[in-house]
């Protein structure tokens, strides 16, 4: 009987924790940002980008009306205009690199990213960066045709327009961490612009805590005729394909954390934040680096060791992707504006903006989170390094069943650096730790490493 009572007590303790959910209190600034995103402005931006006829990275750089040069100068001027209207706190600049001759580059070619940086307001968080991108270059059926009509309305004027709109709206507001709004070139030539930036960021030691790329986010009608207006796909990598496995990844695998990579923790946070503020949109988290054997501008950031994810529409139409503009057998081919759903693109921008704002307002993910493994027991003890931000007031232990994709239970604790969760065994669930600030904003989850002195 005594044994039965003890067992019942453990069950009661382990099942009395509340179900996990994002912070119930919404941030009024994030709500305003979401409302201010404009489908009309996004449409105007996409049509303007298409008006340059081609934005192929090998195209004209001298003309003011045609080619990649005219496009990038217009993007920069548009971001500068918004910056001037919003107080001038954002730094807008070209990030230029020279691409050598390669399979998709006939001659050495300048690849120019347009980068707008909104510095964080909190001293302890200013070096923490969240970056959002879209690629402004376009292509026809071949990436090495610099002169033919390549409108690129969906791929990727849609993502570029979303990034410009976010920069223009969000630069009115203040965030603890730094936000970077970047439109890149050379994506169709092999992720050149993003690769140059990510490698340079790694060398500089930039603390990019999260990166989202938006690529092909404007179409709602797939090749099969199915229309989906309320979903967006979010691709997040697990264990990366590495020739040599660093100790941190080995520890992740040994402890059953294959589904808890930094990219997937970021993606879970994005999904939770976005669906709170844009409830009509469903963020479909897909546990894959990208679409099957395909790629995007988040790859170089992943390869540099940063948490990076990709957003894209749920059901692509390949008649309007990487196609010469033509009518064939009564079918219109080509990436034209009439095949972009501008209202949907605005909703995707809202999803991004809500997630980015939540990340930049909230605290940093806890550091050096360890799960103690000194003895065999059914309780679970953690220790970690305290966050530096003065407004952090506590931490939250979260967990889920090993087969569950999202966090299910949590326990809030005070502003301490060690705690024990009683009656929940590390054998049976996956744990994580979040920081919480005085307003209830939560950080991205940190997966704990095993600790045995």
Sequence positions of predicted segments:
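N-terminal capping segment at the start of a domain
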Residues: 22-66, 320, 328-329, 335
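Short beta-strand segments within Ig-like beta-sandwich modules, predominantly Fibronectin type-III
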Residues: 409-416
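Alpha-helical metal-binding/catalytic segments enriched in His/Glu/Asp
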Residues: 116, 132-133, 137-191, 352
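Beta-strand-rich modules
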Residues: 421-442
């Amino acid at each position: 009987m005594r044994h039965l009572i003890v067992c019942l007590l453990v069950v009661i303790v382990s099942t009395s924790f509340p179900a996990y959910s994002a912070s119930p209190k919404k941030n009024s600034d994030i709500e305003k940002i979401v409302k201010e995103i404009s489908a009309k402005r996004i449409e105007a931006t996409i049509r303007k980008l298409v008006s340059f006829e081609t934005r192929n990275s090998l195209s004209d750089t001298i003309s003011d009306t045609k080619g990649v040069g005219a496009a990038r100068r217009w993007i920069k001027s548009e971001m500068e205009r918004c910056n001037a209207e919003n107080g001038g706190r954002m730094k807008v600049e070209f990030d230029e690199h020279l691409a050598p001759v390669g399979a998709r580059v006939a001659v050495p070619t300048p690849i120019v990213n347009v980068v707008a940086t909104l510095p964080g307001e909190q001293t302890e968080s200013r070096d923490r960066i969240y970056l959002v991108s879209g690629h402004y270059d376009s292509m026809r059926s071949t990436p090495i045709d610099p002169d033919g009509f390549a409108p690129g309305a969906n791929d990727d004027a849609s993502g570029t327009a979303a990034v410009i709109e976010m920069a223009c709206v969000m630069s009115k507001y203040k965030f603890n961490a730094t936000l970077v709004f970047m439109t890149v070139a050379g994506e169709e030539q092999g992720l050149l612009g993003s690769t140059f930036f990510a490698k340079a960021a790694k060398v500089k030691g930039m603390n990019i805590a999260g990166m989202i790329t938006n690529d092909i986010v404007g179409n709602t009608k797939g090749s099969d005729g199915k229309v989906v207006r309320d979903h967006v796909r979010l691709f997040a990598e697990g264990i990366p394909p590495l020739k040599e496995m660093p100790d941190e990844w080995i520890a992740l695998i040994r402890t059953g954390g294959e589904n808890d990579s930094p990219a997937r923790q970021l993606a879970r946070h994005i999904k939770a934040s976005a669906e709170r503020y844009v409830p009509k949109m469903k963020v479909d988290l897909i546990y894959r680096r990208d679409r099957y054997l395909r790629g995007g501008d988040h790859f170089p950031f992943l390869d540099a060791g940063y948490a990076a994810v990709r957003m894209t529409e749920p059901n692509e139409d390949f008649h309007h992707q990487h196609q010469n503009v033509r009518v064939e057998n009564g079918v219109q081919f080509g990436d034209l504006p009439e095949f972009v759903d501008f209202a949907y693109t605005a909703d995707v921008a809202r999803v991004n903006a809500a997630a980015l704002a939540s990340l930049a307002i909230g605290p940093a993910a806890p550091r050096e989170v360890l799960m103690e493994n000194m003895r065999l027991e059914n309780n679970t003890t953690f220790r970690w390094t305290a966050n530096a931000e003065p407004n952090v007031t506590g931490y939250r232990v979260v967990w889920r069943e090993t087969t569950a994709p999202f966090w299910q239970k949590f326990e809030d604790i005070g502003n301490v650096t060690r705690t024990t969760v009683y009656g929940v065994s590390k054998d049976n669930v996956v744990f994580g730790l979040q920081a919480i600030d005085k307003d209830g904003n939560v950080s991205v989850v940190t997966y704990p490493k095993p600790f045995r002195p």
